[in-house]
């Protein structure tokens, strides 16, 4: 089989598992190959097990999420609000219980989900520091975020567990943000950012319907 055909077949398998993930269904070799319209044995020519294809599929989804966030949030003002919206989006992205279960069993991918959003967040924070109209944001706020994000990362796995228990994304997000004032804003400003980020996300979702 030539290289181009192999790549096409592998892409069909990955597309199939991504479709299954998107629908909140449980992936199996049988369901993946059936969705891809390929023979059962074809799967094992490209992937040694379900973990391997899940790993690659999640990798693709994470990359696309990072690109989408950078594109979709660039016009949100002020810049710190983008960081809040990003956390909401990353939590909501994994609300499917099968994917959440897999991620909790493979914490390396949780690390990846966290790390992929950080370069964007850091650029937005730098923008906020240099924004002369955003007088409430200082280097001290930025430094606080750099310190507290380790706590956020640690709490991210807990957030996924709460989703697995059936808790709504908005409630999981609100609890996380309430526990960690990410920029050490005054309480009323922090709450305003939480409310505005939820409103933005919900409006963006409704526009997709």
Descriptions of predicted regions:
Residues 1-26, 30-31:
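Basic, helix-initiating cap at the start of DNA-binding domains
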Residues 56, 70-96:
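Hydrophobic alpha-helical connector segments
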Residues 22-52, 56:
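Helix-turn-helix
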Residues 130, 165-209:
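C-terminal peripheral helix-coil segments that are non-catalytic and often amphipathic
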Residues 88-115, 119, 126-127, 195-196:
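Amphipathic alpha-helical segments used for helix-helix packing
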Residues 12-23, 64-75, 151, 155-163:
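Solvent-exposed, amphipathic alpha-helical segments
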Residues 47, 53-64, 102-104, 113, ...:
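Alpha-helical DNA-contacting segments of helix-turn-helix folds
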Residues 109-158:
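Amphipathic alpha-helical packing segments from all-alpha helical-bundle domains
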């Amino acid at each position: 089989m030539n290289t181009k055909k192999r790549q096409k077949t592998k892409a069909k398998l990955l597309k199939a598992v991504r479709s299954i993930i998107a629908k909140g269904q449980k992936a199996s070799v049988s369901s993946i190959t059936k969705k891809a319209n390929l023979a059962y044995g074809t799967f094992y020519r490209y992937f040694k097990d379900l973990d391997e294809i899940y790993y690659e599929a999640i990798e693709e989804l994470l990359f696309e999420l990072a690109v989408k966030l950078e594109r979709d949030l660039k016009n949100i003002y002020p810049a710190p609000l983008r960081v809040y919206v990003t956390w909401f989006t990353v939590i909501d992205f994994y609300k499917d219980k099968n994917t959440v279960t897999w991620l909790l069993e493979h914490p390396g991918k949780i690390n990846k989900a966290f790390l992929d959003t950080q370069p964007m967040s850091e650029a937005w924070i730098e923008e906020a520091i240099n924004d002369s109209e955003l007088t409430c944001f200082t280097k001290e706020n930025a430094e606080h975020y750099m310190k507290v994000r380790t706590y956020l990362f640690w709490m991210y796995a807990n957030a996924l567990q709460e989703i697995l228990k059936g808790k709504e994304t908005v409630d999981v997000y609100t609890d996380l943000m309430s526990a960690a004032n990410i920029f050490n804003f005054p309480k009323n400003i922090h709450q305003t950012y939480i409310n505005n980020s939820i409103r933005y996300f919900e409006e963006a979702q409704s526009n997709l319907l």
